[in-house]
Amino acid sequence: HKTIDNVIKRTFKHYYDHTDADIIFDRGPWGIPANLELLKKYYDPDPKFLILNRPLVEVLASFLKVKKSGTDKDLTDSLMDPNTGKLKQDMVSSRNIVKSNLPHLKIEYNDLVSDIKKTIEDIYKFFNIPFFKHRYTDLEQLSYNNVKYDDSVMECNLHTIRTDKVKKEELNLEDYFSKDTIDKMKGYDIYV
């Protein structure tokens, strides 16, 4: 038992040792009860969370837009699988954070893409981070420790960004779903 505790503590402490950064936002379903328990026990008893909120129907459509192969049903079933689905885990995590009244900032996707400067400033304020002047045009593809993402091994091209500027790309939802399905998903609130 103590051995496992030591391993977990050191994992949290040293996971980002090789990363040259003062501040790191770790993306993951940390609000899932088991993950939250580990986070509070081994890293920070009072964690703060950032939640990016976007309508479910838009999230699913954006995945379908960039999928490389397979059926739409296979991809949505995979994303929404109650036990292993990435999107389902993120939804459960976000819901648990909000319902648990843990300190969190929920930002809307539309606010992020329509007024990124203000949204970033709101994030800095919430996390008490000193302001940093960002560039929102002429962007570069993400690399991490001089390694760029290779989405050729993924089901979807998830990491390539538009480099000219941050903007919302409009999706015609009816290209991906029936009107009935769109109406059902538009009324779905993950926080209820």
Question: Where do the model's predicted regions map?
Answer:
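PAPS-dependent sulfotransferases, especially Golgi type II membrane carbohydrate sulfotransferases
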Residues: 64-67, 99, 125-192
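PAPS-dependent sulfotransferase catalytic domain
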Residues: 18-134, 147-155
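Alpha-helical packing segments of well-folded alpha/beta enzyme cores
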Residues: 7, 11, 35, 90-95, ...
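Generic alpha-helical secondary structure signal
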Residues: 2, 6, 85, 117-118, ...
